[in-house]
């Protein structure tokens, strides 16, 4: 028999003690504030991997990202506020891409994200 596999490309991972705003708050500047975020919460990364292994066709590539894509600035300012951290400083970088990663296959397979708003109490 041939080798069959699934490839799952996960977005930036966050959850529990892992949150990118903790590192970004320490940087002198974060570029491209209007770019969308492409993140996934740890509980959804695990849940999606299990869900795909049980229900999805093999020999496919999937993108594991939350369905919500606010701008970097909106998301990280709100996250910093909720975590009582200093807000990152932002600057434009016109050469950077504004790519939203979605996966209609994941949506059509019916996975229900547990943390679609990536753990924020309030959304920007």
Q: What label would you give each PLM region?
A:
Residues 4-6, 60, 86, 112:
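Conserved beta-strand segments of alpha/beta enzyme cores
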Residues 46-102:
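Mid/C-terminal beta-alpha module of Rossmann-like enzyme folds, strongest
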Residues 97, 117-124:
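Amphipathic terminal alpha-helices
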Residues 1, 105-107:
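Structural element of the ATP-grasp superfamily
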Residues 1-16:
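Conserved beta-loop-beta element that borders a ligand/cofactor-binding pocket
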Residues 42, 72, 111-114:
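Amphipathic alpha-helical segment in the mid-to-C-terminal domain
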């Amino acid at each position: 028999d041939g080798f069959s596999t699934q490839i799952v490309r996960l977005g930036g991972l966050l959850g529990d003690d892992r949150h990118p705003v903790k590192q970004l708050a320490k940087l002198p500047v974060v570029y491209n504030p209007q770019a969308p975020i492409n993140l996934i919460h740890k509980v959804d990364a695990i849940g999606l991997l299990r869900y795909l292994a049980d229900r999805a066709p093999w020999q496919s590539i999937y993108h594991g990202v939350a369905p919500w894509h606010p701008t970097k600035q909106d998301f990280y300012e709100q996250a910093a506020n909720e975590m009582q951290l200093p807000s990152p400083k932002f600057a434009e970088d016109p050469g950077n891409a504004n790519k939203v990663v979605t996966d209609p296959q994941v949506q059509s397979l019916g996975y229900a994200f547990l943390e679609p708003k990536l753990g924020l109490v309030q959304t920007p």
